[in-house]
Amino acid sequence: MRALVLALVLAAPLAAAEESVRLDAAPIDPRDVASLQAGARTFVNYCLNCHAAGMMRYHKLLEIGLNEQQIKDNLLFTADKVGELMNVAMTRREAKEWLGTVPPDLSVIARARGADWLYTYLRSFYRDSESATGWNNMVYERVAMPHVLWTLSGQQVQVDRKFKNMEQAEGIARQQKSAWKIDVLTPEQAGKDAERFILKTIRTETPGSLSQLEYDLLVRDLVNFMTWMSEPNQLERKQAGYVVLLVLLVLLVLAYLLYKEFWKDVH
């Protein structure tokens, strides 16, 4: 709970800045075991080097169809036993010294941010020579995190296009397959330039080892796993909710019949 509250607090100041970014719907399915297993592999290989998942133990991965030997052979790199937490070897002090900040714990990041935000964010990095890491992000401007998946996705650059009205900008924006946002300049900012609506998109400049479709699928699996990790019992919770609603419906019918029986002789 403390990790969730902290994640929500850290996310709050960025809400206003991210409202203009169009988020893609994350095509995740927590029942897709193959997707969850692939996402777990990507998470351990690329995310767990810097980010911990301090509320998740390795043995929970048994619930997505993996056995202990598979976990030990393929996923257990930062611990000795399957029952241990998914922590990183790097201390907070080392992280601050090497990275300039402490990477957030990702245990409940999906509950704090949402699957759509994560799915769009991980597909929205672009090269920025003015950034300390050489990277920026369409969803989270001036993000401190570098693009750790760039060898897979390739290198993208930001493209700005100006339009005279919002309708033109939105018409072109809806044709984009990547994240986009529209900045609106005030008349004072625009000056004599009548094109006040700036559509910001990204395009691939240098291809990676994966095609765009393959990279989108990899990110989908990763977000699917992170969403499951934030609440491993979500399917059971939803099933229990349906049962509770069914019981309440039956009780409502019984209560109505009882009411009719009590008042049938009252005129």
PLM segments and residue spans:
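Bacterial N-terminal signal peptides
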Residues: R2-P13
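Electrostatic cytochrome c docking/interface patches
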Residues: A12, A16-R41, A52-E63, Q70-I71, ...
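Juxtamembrane interface at the cytosolic side of transmembrane helices
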Residues: R237-H267
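Electron-transfer interface patches adjacent to heme c in soluble/periplasmic c-type cytochromes
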Residues: L66-M138, V143-Q176, D183, K200-Y215
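Short, aromatic-rich amphipathic segments at membrane interfaces
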Residues: R203-V243
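Long, low-complexity intrinsically disordered regions enriched in Ser/Thr, Asp/Glu, Pro/Gly
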Residues: A16, I182-T186, R196, W263, ...
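The canonical Cys-X-X-Cys-His
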Residues: F43-G54, L222
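Stable alpha-helical elements in mature extracytoplasmic
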Residues: D32-S35, T42-F43, V102, G114, ...
